[in-house]
Amino acid sequence: MGALREDAKYIYTRAIEAVLPDEAVRRALDGADFPGRVILVAAGKAAWRMASAAVSALGERIDTGIVITKYGHAQGTIPGIVCREAGHPVPDENSFSAAREALALTENLTADDTVLFLLSGGGSALFESPLVPGVELQDITAQLLACGADIVEINTIRKRLSAVKGGRFARHCAPAHVFAVILSDIVGDPVDMIASGPVSPDSSTCADALAAAEKYALRLSDTARGLLAQETPKTADNVTVRVTGSVRELCAAAAKACRDLGYTPEILTDCEQGVAREVGARLGALARENASCGTPRAFILGGETVVRLTGNGKGGRNQELALAAAAEIAGAENIVVFSVGSDGTDGPTDAAGGLADGGTVERLAAAGKTVADVLPNNDAYHALRDTGDLIITGPTGTNVNDFAAALVR
């Protein structure tokens, strides 16, 4: 199983390297014409790396700027750019203060000026100017993360509680031109949902927001409920958008890495949005069914699963997926299943995801635990830590969803 685990590491490392935003940002900026001042605003988990690439490409054409990213994701200083770190997945005071700085930088611009807006996943929490008290927004965010809502439902509500989401940041920047380079972390690349669409016309409606609030029985103040009933901007005439990077590229890179190692890869889907533990069980069962096929196989899926919080443990969707798969492949000597977040973080943990092999369940039992006990408590992190199956990469500098693979030798 050691060789299989090394194969897994090679595959997820190469896949993530293939979707780092550096070259993609440079391509997006190639040939772009910025006649006046250029103000850089980068928000999201990949913001630092995207901004660094932009400064490398444009140099002194950038007058000033700000990077807003997650704690631990800034990788040093960038000449002429202020770097701020803030809270994720729940916004904190640093999220609010950094947004105020960005709003100040982009006030009173002219039609000749350009806001170079570099956006990636995580921006919903990191770049925030709430229309309700900050503590109330934090509570609503926590409810949304715990209730099992998908990312579109979550961001449909977030947009209406913010002065910078749902196209409102684009309005703030007007009459300046906003040139947006967006790294997609949502299945299907809906630009108005990525980081809650600060510069994109909103395709959702107030009816959608109110329906989601009712569906999940959210506790809302009268002020918040009133904001959900208000429409967001439906046009953004001062914006040019270039989407770069996606989970499709991540899965394709994973498939190439599998072929490098002699596996025959099959991409099952690049738009997985099911419940993490159910997806993990299916992936593990599929690997088990093919355990005696005689040729190395790799089954790959990408997307963003959801976690239903039923306990008070620690973990993330990728860790839950891997642990659920462990129960299906217990005892198998020729199977490994892993699941990772391309940004290097999975839930409120220091792990990127998790891995399971045929011995994971046995090692878990030696720690006095079972998969059946751990998953309802959402405590996959501690379980995989006990079995030595956490995947820890550190912040990667990109963010294009998650991917998982089952390897069969």
Regions found by a protein language model. Give the residues of each.
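An N-terminal, well-structured beta->alpha segment
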Residues: 1-41, 49-50
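Short beta-strand segments
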Residues: 41-43, 66-69, 116-121, 180-186, ...
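A glycine- and small-aliphatic-rich helix-loop capping segment at beta-alpha/alpha-beta transitions
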Residues: 53-62, 80-83, 103, 107, ...
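Glycine-rich oxoanion-binding loops at beta->alpha junctions
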Residues: 69-111, 152-153, 157-158
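Internal gly/pro-rich beta-alpha loop/helix module
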Residues: 133-219
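Accessory alpha-helical/coil subdomains and C-terminal extensions
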Residues: 158, 179, 201-282, 286
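Active-site segments that bind and position negatively charged phosphate/pyrophosphate groups
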Residues: 262-339, 347-348
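Internal helix-turn-beta structural module
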Residues: 323-409
